[in-house]
Amino acid sequence: MPRYAVKGGEVTLKCDHSVRLEHLHKVEWKKGDDKLFMYVKGRTPPFKAWEIPGAKLNTRKSSEKQIHLTNLTFAAGGSYYCVVSMETPSIFTRDSDFKDLTIIDPQDDDPKITFKKDTYYIGEMLEANCTTAPSKPPPHITWLLNDVKVRDSFTKSFSNGIVHGHGYFETKASSIKQLSMEVSQLEDGKLRLTCMATIPGYVNNDSDYADIRNSTVYIEILEESPALPSPVEAASSATLLTLNCMLVVLFLWLF
């Protein structure tokens, strides 16, 4: 059973059991204490459906093995399970494990990365912010440095306090995460900075996510910052300039 489904979309919930059809008596689908769908072998028709909050049941795609829900809203989220009953040698009933379904309203744009400049010197502090598009639930943000996850100690999460939409079921929110770390030596002189915005949170780069958006920027890294004159050199230059000015004045006075 999928863990996530998209608002307005559809989902198939499967009841995996190994009972052969000739031994099967009944299969029920429930959400909490509420009945959703029931199959009883030998009845005509064999199916009976109840109203499902937040979804419509497609009976043509439902059977003793699965139910198919369409037109999903947030109210369809919750814990589902199936109950399988056998008729031989005597009626035996067993409940499946509860499986949670979360309805999401995904991001409609890539995250935005902002930073003060696109060139840094080794040893400087790099600070960047990543802001996601709104979604429900809010996306999780993961920073990647040259495709490697940045340690959480270098990041800090913020809330912009902006809620999009009205009512509990329609509100969406953005996520913000700051990166702050010292720039180190890089072989190619380039730093590839990626912001991943995902639902659910980060597992690895190749995982399947219910919702994923990426943004990548490249930052040039220079080995040395421009050399500044030492106090002694600065003082010597000032003294030399003063002497040159005095010589010019003396020359003009004599001639």
Region spans (language model):
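Proline-enriched interdomain boundary motifs that mark the N-terminal boundary
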Residues: 1, 106-114, 226-229
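Short beta-strand segments of immunoglobulin-like
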Residues: 1-5, 18, 114-120, 132-133
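Extracellular Ig-like/FN3 beta-sandwich strand-entry sites
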Residues: 10, 75-79, 125, 188-192
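Ligand-binding face of N-terminal immunoglobulin V-set domains in extracellular IgSF glycoproteins
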Residues: 14, 55-100
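N-terminal V-set
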Residues: 20-53, 136-160
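Aromatic sugar-binding surface patches on proteins
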Residues: 51-66, 165-180
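Extracellular/luminal immunoglobulin-like beta-sandwich modules
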Residues: 79-105, 191-228
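Cleavable C-terminal sorting propeptides in eukaryotic secreted/cell-surface proteins
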Residues: 236-255
